Amino acid sequence: MINALTYEEMIKKINNNYIERGLRNDYIGVFITRPDLESGKNILNSLDYYHHLTGRNVNFYLPGFGSYWGENYPDKETVAKIDGTEWYFSNEQFVKFTRKLERKTKWVYSGESELILLPLIDGKIEFDKILIFYLDDMLRDGAIKSVSAFFQQLSRLFESKSTLSEIHVDLRKDNAIELIKGAILKNLPYGIGDVITRGNYFVIMN
């Protein structure tokens, strides 16, 4: 998990990964949630763990979250501590981030927890097609046991060399986002992919 107080900060970190690590073709996860949502608390209560778990395989950015803020954000609240450093959340910055992402895409924030996947192709985010998991709908209908269990499964999926190879190759194709969706759903364990597909919890928006 990577803090992204603002949209601009997320883009800066993505560009740094491109320059420093050569990540030209990748997938970017944006975990839209708030501390007052039960589905968000599920991850925030173990944020230190998921920060280390997912950082090796896929970057999940957390809008409205950050560290080392000083007194610049009067609405900040402490939500977690990672490697001894306090992380904060700002509703104001969260709203600014989601509104900017709405302007960049056809996505409209539901008010609940969502996971958005954006393809990074030749070092640039492709905003014309995005993948969205509606996490609260998945929880209510029993498609997943918990958000934390789902992120654990996604992390295992992204650790798979065969899955990563499949996704990276698909990124360069015209129907990349459809192929990536298929690769993710196919490799989720315990038939979860079939359940998610039938329930329309995972959509392509363009």
Features from the language model and the residues they span:
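N-terminal leader/targeting and pre-domain segments
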Residues: 1-25, 146-171
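Local sequence-structure signature of Cys/Sec-based thiol-disulfide redox active-site neighborhoods
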Residues: 2-83
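Extended charged low-complexity segments that act as oligomerization/scaffolding linkers
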Residues: 61-100, 123-129
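A short, hydrophobic beta-strand/beta-hairpin element that forms part of a small beta-sheet core
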Residues: 107-130
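Membrane-inserting effector segments that mediate pore formation, membrane fusion
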Residues: 168-206
